[in-house]
């Protein structure tokens, strides 16, 4: 099976289980989506391996809660996920990722830099 990045508009029972493993701090009811607030996920073998929340406002986009399940980290899932989010939103010219909740800032800084983001005092920016 191929790794697929998709925008989640509805959550299956399995999606809810997988999102609970990705984001144990969020309840299913807090994961509402619309045109401004989106969730993108990486799916492999019908299971979600990673996800990111996206908030859009005109030409600005904010990423938060980017997380890949521990067992599948360091295999390019997060990079592919962010690249596809950016590609899926061509009208967004400025992206922001806050460092709130980042588990290891040095690892995340290297990851974001590899994606073309520049470090700011409280996160990363890509224009």
From Swiss-Prot:
Binding site residues for CoA: 66-68, 72-79
Gene Ontology biological process terms from the UniProt entry: pantothenate biosynthetic process; zymogen activation
Keyword vocabulary terms for this entry: Pantothenate biosynthesis
Keyword Cytoplasm in record: no
Residue ranges constituting the N-acetyltransferase domain according to the UniProt record: 1-127
Annotated knockout phenotype: Deletion results in a pantothenate auxotrophy. Deletion mutant accumulates pro-PanD.
GO-annotated molecular function: acyltransferase activity, transferring groups other than amino-acyl groups
Superkingdom to which the source organism belongs: Bacteria
Assigned protein family: Belongs to the PanZ/PanM family.
Function: Controls both the activation and catalytic activity of PanD in a coenzyme A (CoA)-dependent fashion. Binding of CoA or a derivative to PanM leads to interaction with PanD, which promotes the processing and activation of pro-PanD, and subsequent substrate-mediated inhibition of the active form of PanD. Lacks acetyltransferase activity.
Subunit-structure text: Interacts with PanD in the presence of CoA. Monomer.
UniProt protein name: PanD regulatory factor
Organism in which the protein naturally occurs: Salmonella typhimurium (strain LT2 / SGSC1412 / ATCC 700720)
